[in-house]
Swiss-Prot record:
One GO CC term, this protein: cytosolic large ribosomal subunit
Origin species: Shigella boydii serotype 4 (strain Sb227)
Assembly, per entry: Part of the 50S ribosomal subunit; part of the 5S rRNA/L5/L18/L25 subcomplex. Contacts the 5S rRNA. Binds to the 5S rRNA independently of L5 and L18.
UniProtKB keywords: Ribonucleoprotein, Ribosomal protein, RNA-binding, rRNA-binding
Protein name per UniProt: Large ribosomal subunit protein bL25
UniProt keyword Cell cycle present: no
Amino acid sequence: MFTINAEVRKEQGKGASRRLRAANKFPAIIYGGKEAPLAIELDHDKVMNMQAKAEFYSEVLAIVVDGKEIKVKAQDVQRHPYKPKLQHIDFVRA
């Protein structure tokens, strides 16, 4: 099982997302279940290495946010059109 450390996003929007990407991070969201959607930020290089394996897309992942572990599955991955970079990931609670 993959474990990903994340932080809750403090600001949202296009400018905030661009600042995250410039800092080698990228935005993501966790939704589903009975809880409210949670906007998070992830470290780009760590997740890029994880998503290179097929198991990233088929297995349940653990995301640790503020010391709390959330079980999720990758629902949608948005990539940069020509650079080997991730733009955004949607996770659904498992």
